[in-house]
Amino acid sequence: MKKRLKIKNILILINILFLLGCCIFYGSRMIHYYRIENPKIEDVKTLVELVTLGKNLTDNGDGLYHENDIYYYKGKNVNNYLLYSGRLFRIVSIDKSGYMKLITEELQTSMVWGYNQEFENSYVRNWLNDDTDSYKSFLHSLDNTQGLLVNTNTCVDETDGKTITCDKNYESTVGLLSVYEYNLAGASDSYLNIGSYWWTSNKDSDGNAWYVYKKGTVNNDSSSGYTYYSYGVRPTITINGKISNFKGTGTKEDPYEIIFDKGKNLNDQYVGEYILFNDIVWRIQETEEKYVKLASSDGIKDKDYILAKYGPKNMYSADYGIGNYLNVTFYNSLKDKDSILLGVFNNGKYDRTNKYDLSKINEYTVTCNIGLLQIGDLFINDVEKYYLATRTLTSDNSIYQVLEDGKIYIGNLKEEMKIRPTLHVKPDLKIVSGSGTKDDPYKLG
């Protein structure tokens, strides 16, 4: 009896030791893999490591997916916001090298795609990458690009809207998003659907460029006869994600932010940031050695919006019409005139008669204190229902207008619309406070 009891106790002890060993083994494995998937934040050295943490991944619903060595975001509610060089971007995808493709959250301008051209020869590609005498490129507006930006692969496959592939790529510093990538993210049910019209990088067999409609569907009616439509431009760039100078969590309220040291002069700040000047909030358009170009962040107000007709003709002038109001009435209402510089503003023509060539837009200019924006300027879509200074060759009684959803139309001079001024100021004005956002603009001292 005692012998049986002894054997029983030994078996119980063996079982206990076995169970204890299993708990230790599998518990340690669980801790090991948990640490791999969820490293301490202080162990995360680079932006790409933080973004691709295991806890951020999903295989259903909204979130970050990982397939075939590519990470990509899908769905509406995703924390993929990134702030760089004064612009808010969304992270689209990450490749196996740690390169992160970004797209601007907002439209950066609106323009005609091109004149029966492939993306690589289009006006949009030129505006994205190449400076001219008529306009500064989107690339020109970015700071601290050295060592951060890498070339972007833009998918340029021809598509009929049903068979959508991404086999043919064009390499440039700045590109556009493809229909393929738009669909991969969830199309109209994704974070990429911002309720505006904007170009993709693809064309159909008839030479029509595809664009995203305001409801999120993809369309290709980009022209009618000899008339070509202007839609919004959302540039894509690719950054090296193996950087350590960052902060943030990727939410809209606390985006990932790439951090660089900046000076205190106005021209040390980023294009796209906001400044309070003469009690008006302005957005920085250009930062140059000799001047900084600003555009009001909204139409001029006196409690309500001040509305005005363009004038008796579409030539912009300080002597009559909207130009006279801006350079006399509005200018004289400003307290700090000493900081304003004379500026050269384009008042050129843009339509089918010159094949919508944006480089022709500086064939007529006007020098004055206060001007209007033109097609191809940054952030022209921030405000709706106002006049641009861009004319047409076909009629002296028409002028371009910015309407809703990122669309540009040729309108009548006699319509009453908002007034959105632009001006040049001294570059060495000092920043004393503010964070440069629209709600907390920089203040000058």
Enumerate the language-model features and the residues they cover.
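Hydrophobic alpha-helical membrane-insertion segments, chiefly the h-region
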Residues: 18-30
